[in-house]
Amino acid sequence: MNEATKRTIVKEIDAILYEEHKVLDHGFIRVVDYMGSDSAIVQAARVSYGKGTKQISQDEALIKYLMRHHHTTPFEMCEIKFHVKLPIFVARQWIRHRTANVNEYSARYSILDNEFYTPKPEQVAKQSDNNKQGSGEAFDPDTSKEIIDSLINDSNLVYSHYEKFIEQGLAREIARTNLMLNYYTQFYWKIDLHNLLHFLKLRADKHAQYEIRVYAEVMLDIIKKWVPLAYNAFVEYCLESACISRTGLEIIRKLIKGENVTREESNIGKREWGELMSILDKQS
């Protein structure tokens, strides 16, 4: 508790307030404000039966219990506000998480800078053969360079047209429409901890698109500083855990007993079987 402000503060977060954490080639994320800490979570959980502050070890055990049993309300007592600069196509994925408050830079009122995202060669990949919305293996260096050069040339070309439209007096709300999705935008994004952790579980996953995953990874480091007990529980029970179906559990029990189990007799789909075998470090 800070005596001057009469509110709980987290020194590790105060130390990085407004500090830009660089992401991608022109992007960043920074903490603008926050409310609450690990203590706010346990305080909310204990209010129903009037218990006061406990020892750290007891707080940690309670937070693990809440996370393990999906008691979400106490985690909603903490909130954090970010200022994010990111490519428009990343922002469109990001904004699908509708449980936050957001206000975005408006190209109706302001002129966008000539800043666009250019992928690194290793990120210029072919369409995945088994994932309709994901990337597969990278192109050869020559093809990657050709694609990147085209992206850069196209981006510069449309921006030159955008500038010409503005000079001609075209309304900004129309002039912006020819800009590509790799141009950068900015927004303020405020969210409670429960919904933030859900966002991070999806976007920090190895299957998430690289360009949004790198933002999520920076946010994970920030969460670790802000609410370390909740962060550890999240990693333990959500981020690095596995969801296994009833049938999957039956298969595991049989394997523990030394029984031979096949996918066909288990009545389980190929994809789920492969995921289960991957979890168990067994060949499918």
From Swiss-Prot:
Catalyzes the reductive methylation of 2'-deoxyuridine-5'-monophosphate (dUMP) to 2'-deoxythymidine-5'-monophosphate (dTMP) while utilizing 5,10-methylenetetrahydrofolate (mTHF) as the methyl donor, and NADPH and FADH(2) as the reductant. The lineage of its organism: Bacteria, Pseudomonadati, Pseudomonadota, Alphaproteobacteria, Rickettsiales. Residues 122-142 are annotated as: Disordered. Residues 27-237 form the ThyX domain. Gene3D superfamilies: 3.30.1360.170. It comes from the Bacteria. Its EC number is 2.1.1.148. PANTHER family: FLAVIN-DEPENDENT THYMIDYLATE SYNTHASE (PTHR34934:SF1). Keywords: FAD, Flavoprotein, Methyltransferase, NADP, Nucleotide biosynthesis, Transferase. CDD domains: ThyX. It is an enzyme of class 2 (transferase). Belongs to the thymidylate synthase ThyX family. Pathway: Pyrimidine metabolism; dTTP biosynthesis. FAD binds at residues 73, 96-98, 104, 192-194, 198. This is Flavin-dependent thymidylate synthase. A motif (ThyX motif) lies at residues 96-106. Homotetramer.
